[in-house]
Amino acid sequence: KIQIRIIKGCQYKDWFIIAKEKAEIDRLSAHYRLNIDTSTINRLFSDWVIHDFGKLSAEYDKDSPVLISNTMEFIKNISNKFVIVVMDGMSEFDWSILKTSFWDIKYTKASLFAMIPTVTSVSRQCLLSNKHPINLQNPWSQQKEENEFRECAKELGFKENQISYCRGYDNELKPSIKCAAVIVNDIDDMVHGQTQERLGMYNGLSVMAQNGQLARMGNKYIKQGFDIFITAD
């Protein structure tokens, strides 16, 4: 049914629904040890990206940025004290498992497009800098990432002592902080060390969800008065 819907023609928002449905199929397939191949959907999406991705910069949605490069500005327009948690390499499939640890946290979910190429040095820097790849100081290296984020935060109106860039789950933010980026590499590390493909990711993410580190970190920052935005890159 998904493939038929794609062949009939998709608008960009249709892909958000398709991604969620595909993730659920993949999750159930891993959970019940079924051999369901959804790779055709990936191929059809690649075809759509080649023809239509370039048009997305002209799209607008008041409820969510369309491209990841507009995220920081969008967040600043709705929050004056926030933490953006970047789960490096997270997919819709990954989130479908991790979200089970958020049973006691109310949240809303939105979808948007990563930057192409989707390598970390490009897409994550675009996310944290509010820039397109062509405007990055160094799109092929992450050495300037923190600097890009800090410059972006200042352009959005934050002072130096209100900005924090850190990694991992156990950071303590100073009382002066109003704009923070937290980078978490667990999923990306899991992907690169994976030998059992989807089943291995399912098992690893299930353990990660049971541990609840991400949810605990979110709760901690919420109690400190921050709005929390968890995103992939």
Protein language model regions, located:
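…; additionally, a secondary subgroup of soluble metalloenzymes is captured
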Residues: 1-83, 89-232
